[in-house]
């Protein structure tokens, strides 16, 4: 599921990281939450409960309830085990007095009917997919959507097989327990969630037919790119999903496979993490900073949280990924943002794979300090370039094309594991026009390429007060060029 560790070089690399963490503390307070003594807390999911309690699930099948995670003094946190004996839940939410979990073999509803603080009713909502014991057969589940459906993405068997029913598919579980096959083409999810509009996205990891890890839109009826599980269309009398051409390019295959929805945002391998995981939408109304309607995406290998700004162009999602939060104690898997209070909760585990954080597991709280960093807030595609929106007025440097540079590339769409960066280009930034309020800049660019990742560096840009960008890079996946 996840890739091998990338080590940070000694010397100057450590100095750069230390400087970045110091800057991060000015904007975001990251605090470890004490864990229960003796508990092996490799967290797989987080659910927010009434009365500011939090439920977490573990790799080994336990459910714990945390009290006090919102308090200023985290040393007073208490824990109570709510359930045990489950099968690696990777999705949890609270609704109408019940805790819903997505386990490897099923979606389950847990209830505490006698009020003693532990679950005594375990009800199977749906178990319509297969498992065979392979370690890779994860099942990630969403909270309920607007219609009450739970979306479940099913990992393949191993890296490239589909030995159990519906592996490599996304299913919707309806409130009355029916299972609806919804999308094919999935490989190795790391998380699933909604954007502010209620559309569903998941993260998929690098591997066969995935040149690099990415964030993907689960449009009903779509093909997500990996054909390994396509054989299961016969189980529901569905039309046979498309057969891609090995060694092609996604932009080429889209022309002949209309069901193929491209990755919304590609995370270039090692540059923007290696194992994207949980997804949290910011609909907090500014309680977590100026990122309203954007997504936060966990990163297991690099122990980070990235920030994603999406847009739709010609009906297709695309957008930019930015570096955001770093320095977590272990590899981040689940994320949950409390949109009422502005607290971001992150769970971590090395899970047998290495992570930069170094610890075997962690549970952490992140709070915005109220100080806004100077950042590129959004990056939006234009017919002949991009528009950047800043979090505060920029200085004159933002109107100088020399303050920016760009390169672009794509990946081989192939059955082999991953892909190098190929078809490289160097788009030329010919003009940079600041808006009257200096909070945005229009970059005119020669050489935009449909289907390429466009990597922007804005290292010469400073704010009106002379502050450099906290993160001066963005990676934009240009699936469509606006007309």
Where are the language model's segments positioned?
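Beta-propeller domains with acidic blade repeats across secreted/periplasmic ectodomains
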Residues: 23-373, 379-385, 396
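Intrinsically disordered, low-complexity Ser/Thr/Gly-rich stretches
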Residues: 400-437
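Generic structural detector for well-ordered beta-strands
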Residues: 34, 81, 389, 405, ...
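A structural signal for the main folded, soluble domain(s) of proteins
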Residues: 251-259, 418, 457, 468, ...
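N-terminal secretory signal peptides that target proteins for export/translocation
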Residues: 1-6
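Bacterial N-terminal signal peptides
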Residues: 9-19
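Acidic, Ser/Thr/Gly/Pro-rich low-complexity segments and short DxT(G/T)-type signature motifs
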Residues: 369-378, 395, 411-412, 421, ...
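Extracytoplasmic/surface-exposed domains of secreted proteins
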Residues: 384-408, 436-471
